[in-house]
Amino acid sequence: MSAPATRDMRTSAPGVFMAVLWRDIFVTGRELPVFLAQVILQPLFMLFVFGKVLSNLGYTRPGYAHLLFPGIVALTALLTSLQSTALPLVLEFSFTKEIEDRLLAPIPTALVAVEKMIFAAMRALIAAVCMFPIGILILGSVPWRAAGAPEFVVILILGVLAGSAMGLTMGTLVPPNRISIAFSLVLTPLLFTGCSQYPWPTLDSLRWFQIVTLFNPLTYVSEGMRGALVPYVPHMRAWVCVAALVFWLAAFSAIGIWGFIRRAID
């Protein structure tokens, strides 16, 4: 290939990348009510039952709803990005074959995988932000600190990207006929060992379980958001959460992109 042709391809790659991303955003915009119903229903009921019903019945301590809310936002962000990457990839690689159109685009295969991650992360950002008006509607108020906004934004972005990287890994490495089993084996432990319902430092009396939670990326999203929104509650240090999320993001991205390229070649 000549030098000018190579330069043209490099110049056009960002434009093609943005065009593919915009196409996905446009499709989601047309189906926004359905998308929101899919991703918000579960955290909405968790917030309602654990934050409102149990509180009104006296089964939780006063203020538990404000402790719970950052964890529910974290759960919504990470699970939405994970599912928004994994499930479409399984369908596109095995049934609809829609991924073949993307692979024909004049951009590196790795960038197609990155586009999938970024698009899923954007969907997760929308879902996480929507939890604030829902929280106000259900709880009457939600914790928010202007001083904690930068930390919250950093943790949120790292959390949705880590979740989409996890989804990329699952969607490319798990066989299509095993994806439902994989989700059953992954999502339930992810949900209950991610410190979304309880602060990590309070698990001192259950040391073995406290150690187990460290292997769940959701733990660091929950703790980081808790530190940003309700700093008076025991929580991990912000730098620990950021460092851990960067590690999980890098690890799952490397594995997921490798798996994506392998599936694309096959």
Label every model-predicted segment.
Residues 2-42:
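Aromatic- and glycine-rich beta-strand/loop motifs that create alpha-glucan
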Residues 7, 31-35, 67-71, 79-83, ...:
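Short alpha-helical transmembrane interface motifs in multi-pass membrane proteins
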Residues 29, 33, 52-62:
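Short, hydrophobic transmembrane alpha-helix segments
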Residues 45-50, 65-138, 185-186, 191:
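Hydrophobic alpha-helical transmembrane segments of multi-pass membrane transport proteins
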Residues 54, 171-215:
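Transmembrane helix segments
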Residues 109, 113-185, 235-257:
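Alpha-helical transmembrane segments and their short interhelical loops
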Residues 142-143, 195-251:
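Membrane-interfacial helix-loop-helix junctions in multi-pass membrane proteins
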